[in-house]
């Protein structure tokens, strides 16, 4: 029976993206899943977490895998369908802004990672996470500093999360014009700050973020002060449902209830 930790092995980052995963497979700890998030630093839009399991053999089709932040948009879009085609399993979880507000971004991120791993159709023998430990997983795991540039499965998860979130933010621009979501994807940029100053925040902004609250106060936008602790209004729930329907083609799990509960009411749209 595989142990919880592999024997001590020297892994050099320069050895390639598959070196760490290969060492785990050789020691009987596969399949190996990578998990990563996108949107942690954004002040609008969801936090998106993806988990991905790649097979033990290197695929030439995925040779360009790297940290999604280092890849251009065209390259990410090219890799996105290839990862979904060749991965043994993948699962993407969207955590909406009101849930990030309610739980806090770090706790929401950890819970999203747990759900992404739990949603895989193939049970991993080991999980590699990008940067920090994910407590509460049912299988052994290891945080990898700079993981999306050091392990192919994390890099693949990073691309899945990034492309899925970017596509949603383009959809969000159509629902909330004037903010430039299609361009800055909800991150804090001069253009986004200027839009907040002009219009005040919309329901997709994260009111637990200081810049969003200040913009709301400066523009007189009414916002529920208890949003940071509970979910938004029924109007927000309706908008969330509209966005959820737009996500059906992405094969994701849309978290529509507190993420700390495993029996949360989720609209599950496949796991790849």
From Swiss-Prot:
Gene Ontology CC, one term: ribonuclease H2 complex
Catalytic activity as recorded in UniProt: Endonucleolytic cleavage to 5'-phosphomonoester
Cofactor annotation comment: Manganese or magnesium. Binds 1 divalent metal ion per monomer in the absence of substrate. May bind a second metal ion after substrate binding.
Pfam family, one: RNase_HII
EC number: 3.1.26.4
A molecular function (GO) term: RNA binding
SS bond list: none
Chief localization: cytoplasm
Residues of the RNase H type-2 domain: 30-221
Swiss-Prot/TrEMBL keywords: Cytoplasm, Endonuclease, Hydrolase, Manganese, Metal-binding, Nuclease
Gene3D superfamilies: Ribonuclease H-like superfamily/Ribonuclease H
Protein name (Swiss-Prot/TrEMBL): Ribonuclease HII
């Amino acid at each position: 029976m595989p142990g919880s930790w592999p024997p001590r092995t020297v892994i050099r980052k320069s050895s390639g993206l598959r070196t760490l995963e290969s060492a785990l497979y050789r020691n009987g700890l596969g399949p190996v899943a990578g998990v990563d998030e996108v949107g942690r630093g954004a002040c609008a839009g969801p936090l998106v977490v993806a988990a991905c399991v790649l097979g033990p053999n290197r695929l030439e089709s995925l040779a360009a895998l790297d940290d999604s932040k280092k890849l251009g948009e065209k390259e990410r879009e090219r890799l996105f369908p290839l990862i979904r085609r060749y991965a043994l399993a993948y699962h993407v979880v969207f955590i909406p802004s009101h849930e990030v507000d309610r739980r806090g971004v770090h706790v929401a991120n950890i819970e999203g990672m747990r759900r992404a791993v739990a949603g895989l159709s193939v049970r991993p023998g080991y999980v590699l996470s990008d940067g920090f430990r994910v407590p509460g997983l049912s299988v052994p795991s290891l945080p990898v500093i700079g993981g999306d540039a050091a392990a192919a499965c994390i890099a693949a998860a990073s691309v899945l999360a990034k492309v899925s979130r970017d596509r949603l933010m383009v959809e969000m621009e159509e629902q909330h014009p004037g903010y430039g979501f299609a361009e800055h994807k909800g991150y804090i940029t001069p253009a986004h700050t200027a839009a907040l100053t002009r219009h005040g925040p919309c329901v997709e902004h994260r009111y637990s973020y200081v810049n969003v609250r200040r913009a709301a106060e400066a523009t007189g936008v009414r916002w529920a002060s208890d949003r940071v602790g509970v979910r938004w209004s029924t109007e927000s729930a309706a908008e969330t449902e509209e966005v959820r329907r737009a996500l059906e083609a992405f094969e994701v799990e849309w978290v529509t209830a507190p993420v700390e509960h495993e029996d949360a009411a989720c609209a599950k749209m496949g796991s790849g």
